[in-house]
């Protein structure tokens, strides 16, 4: 069994959001009729996507070809729209979540959902989270690595974490809104450098902000193998010990003590990195994730895990399926 925790999907179409809300900044999908579409932001091409980004049948064909049993579906992060008016973001979230629920209902043994929330308005986010879990049946939601000016330690977000604990709703944290200009403008740096840095900042903000202390039952998984955190946790821990005046303002506990308290996906593209990741984060806390259907993802899901000679069959099964089931609170028999 292979369960992919990190995949992205869009509706085939949605209303013209600029017309709907009266201002720009929104993403639209422009189809060309050849199994390809342009994601446009204010008329400029953000990304070109193929039909596997919106067509469940195309997705299922590729899942069957690569032996993926289940995909956890989440929106493309550019759709988060935390910058917009909260009620408008809620409207978009509901549109995305309803479409996601319809896709899952058509193939309930192949797909599970991670909803999206208007995180810039925590009171609205809490209500939509409850709807995602109670009405739509999602085991979790996807949130950004920061919410506008808030890092994930912001007290304004604590009601969202409290509700996630209450509902047993898992949180998948995905980097987004990286610096795109200046020194980061060339060489795909926002994706190659910015994303790992964003994820590391998200992990550190939750640790140093005391989020895991205040919400010990919170289940969180960070994308892209936790960014650079697994490799730099020694530096982070040492800095915490040397400068508690700066690092321990909100939580006196050394960051190393939280290893094993959260999950990451497996998307690191390198056997040495995956070995380090499982050693640092724990073999019970790393989950197969591919970033399907995008080119920076793992193109053959689970191939890196399978290639690891030092992993026994039990460990490989945990990484490919068992840890995902644990994180999502689901049973293997639901998908067999």
Curated annotation (Swiss-Prot):
EC number of this enzyme: 4.1.1.45
SUBUNIT field: Monomer.
Protein's job: Converts alpha-amino-beta-carboxymuconate-epsilon-semialdehyde (ACMS) to alpha-aminomuconate semialdehyde (AMS). ACMS can be converted non-enzymatically to quinolate (QA), a key precursor of NAD, and a potent endogenous excitotoxin of neuronal cells which is implicated in the pathogenesis of various neurodegenerative disorders. In the presence of ACMSD, ACMS is converted to AMS, a benign catabolite. ACMSD ultimately controls the metabolic fate of tryptophan catabolism along the kynurenine pathway.
Name of the protein this chain belongs to: 2-amino-3-carboxymuconate-6-semialdehyde decarboxylase
GO molecular function, one term: zinc ion binding
The UniProt record lists the keyword Metal-binding: yes
Annotated source species: Bos taurus (Bovine)
Gene Ontology biological process: negative regulation of quinolinate biosynthetic process; secondary metabolic process
Chain positions recorded as substrate binding sites: 47
Assigned keywords, A-Z: Decarboxylase, Lyase, Metal-binding, Zinc
Source organism superkingdom: Eukaryota
GO cellular component: cytoplasm; cytosol
Catalytic activity: 2-amino-3-carboxymuconate 6-semialdehyde + H(+) = 2-aminomuconate 6-semialdehyde + CO2
Top EC class of this enzyme: lyase
Pathway where this protein functions: Secondary metabolite metabolism; quinolate metabolism
This protein's encoding gene: ACMSD
CDD domains attached to this UniProt entry: metallo-dependent_hydrolases
Record: residues binding Zn(2+): 6, 8, 174, 291
Family per similarity comment: Belongs to the metallo-dependent hydrolases superfamily. ACMSD family.
